[in-house]
């Protein structure tokens, strides 16, 4: 009888783990940084792309949202 944990099974499990970490943690963190730097100067097309990224990576955004909470910036009024 062969072992349940063959080399191929371990490799497939590591691929699944790395893809899930990438989808749930790494890419949403990069998107948070991108949104934080470009939110107030984005064009309408770029804003639509931002909304797409938010909806596509929503589970990761939801997972990171308690830890990364960016407050809106104050407006600078010129007298």
Swiss-Prot record:
Catalytic reactions on record: a plastoquinone + NADH + (n+1) H(+)(in) = a plastoquinol + NAD(+) + n H(+)(out); a plastoquinone + NADPH + (n+1) H(+)(in) = a plastoquinol + NADP(+) + n H(+)(out)
Keyword Transmembrane helix on entry: yes
GO molecular function terms noted in the UniProt entry: oxidoreductase activity, acting on NAD(P)H, quinone or similar compound as acceptor; quinone binding
TM spans (from-to): 10-30, 48-68
Keyword terms of this UniProt record: Membrane, NAD, NADP, Plastoquinone, Quinone, Thylakoid, Translocase, Transmembrane, Transmembrane helix, Transport
Stored Pfam families: NdhL (PF10716)
Subcellular location: Cellular thylakoid membrane
Enzyme Commission identifier(s): 7.1.1.-
A GO CC term assigned to this protein in UniProt: plasma membrane-derived thylakoid membrane
Origin: domain of life: Bacteria
Key word Transport present: yes
Recorded topology in the membrane: Multi-pass membrane protein
Function: NDH-1 shuttles electrons from an unknown electron donor, via FMN and iron-sulfur (Fe-S) centers, to quinones in the respiratory and/or the photosynthetic chain. The immediate electron acceptor for the enzyme in this species is believed to be plastoquinone. Couples the redox reaction to proton translocation, and thus conserves the redox energy in a proton gradient. Cyanobacterial NDH-1 also plays a role in inorganic carbon-concentration.
Family assignment from sequence similarity: Belongs to the complex I NdhL subunit family.
Subunit description: NDH-1 can be composed of about 15 different subunits; different subcomplexes with different compositions have been identified which probably have different functions.
UniProt-recorded name of the protein: NAD(P)H-quinone oxidoreductase subunit L
Organism: Microcystis aeruginosa (strain NIES-843 / IAM M-2473)
